[in-house]
Amino acid sequence: MNRKVLKVIDGETVFPPPIWMMRQAGRYLPEYRETRKKAGSFLDLCYSPDLAVEVTLQPIRRFGFDAAILFSDILVVPHALGRDLRFEEGKGPLMTPIDADEIFWLETEGVAKRLEPVYETVRLVREQLPDETTLLGFCGAPWTVATYMIAGHGTPDQAPARLFAYRFPEAFEKLLNDLADVSAEYLIEQLGAGADAVQIFDSWSGVLDEDCFERFCIRLVARIVQKVRAVYPQARIIGFPKGAGMLYAGYREKTGVDMLGLDWSVPLSFAALLQEEGAVQGNLDPLRVVAGGNALDEGVDAILERMGQGPLVFNLGHGITPQAPIENVQRMIDRVRGGKS
């Protein structure tokens, strides 16, 4: 088995570095938009294995990325917990905000089993992927998932969730613990279905102060990692605490993740120091892919120059945007793999 992404996660230096993109199955691809229309709703797309397999494989067929990531959404976990969830064009995910009393009535028993269509997608993708392509599963980190459950939608700085945590600490701690336990079961099921590694997305960790980052992010991700490794001791886990800044230091050691996903705001000098401790993933600004040209080339070259001699999975610093031209994605891949565009 020659899955380059797994080699990097294990600490090997691979050159040229393997590459994939967060949200690589998405609206920038015309074939994705066609499949999305067939599905009806975004959730129907997530829960229909045949269609979810198709969109997971589309960027692999087109670009030959070194990893496929399961097509789903971080909010299927609260949906499985019984919370309503819908996606509206231009508004993103919408939920009825949970209140403190409701948290104590959340029933977590057997929740992961309700997500069987997701595991079927994993099984089918693994069967159809080229053998050298890594298959990644994922979940949202408890803090990030909780922010949507509390506000009912995304907010610029997640003030509703932060205020909720200060006002209702007991309820908030229970919510985070419940989400961690269900998420661990969810990842265990994905690994059992054929995922090679999993990523924990903490997209809103950057809005927290240091104390809350330790209590709401690090503690809960560590809890997930411990529970997953109790079942799969060799499980490879990627942590992505977007916006963590200086708090990236120590994150790997405290949580137990194998590889650090870095957002584009992380200085490359700091990223290189983090790489001395183990594998890193990232961290091109997604808007450089939209811009193309010299802006794209210079961004790619800077990352390769600073981190290409160590364990690196080349990625964006967050998800690719719908506005990204396909030719710019190909230009980025060619440049990473050694062909100048």
Swiss-Prot record:
Localisation per UniProt entry: Cytoplasm
EC code(s) of this entry: 4.1.1.37
| Keywords recorded for this protein, A-Z | Cytoplasm, Decarboxylase, Lyase, Porphyrin biosynthesis
Q: Where is this site: Transition state stabilizer?
A: D73
**Broad EC category:** lyase
Q: Which residues form the signal peptide?
A: none
Pathway where it operates = Porphyrin-containing compound metabolism; protoporphyrin-IX biosynthesis; coproporphyrinogen-III from 5-aminolevulinate: step 4/4
Coiled coil segments of this chain: none
What Pfam family is a match, any one?
URO-D
Protein's UniProt keywords contain Cytoplasm: yes
Per UniProt, subunit arrangement is: Homodimer.
Q: Supply the NCBIfam families for this chain.
A: hemE (TIGR01464)
Q: What is this protein called?
A: Uroporphyrinogen decarboxylase
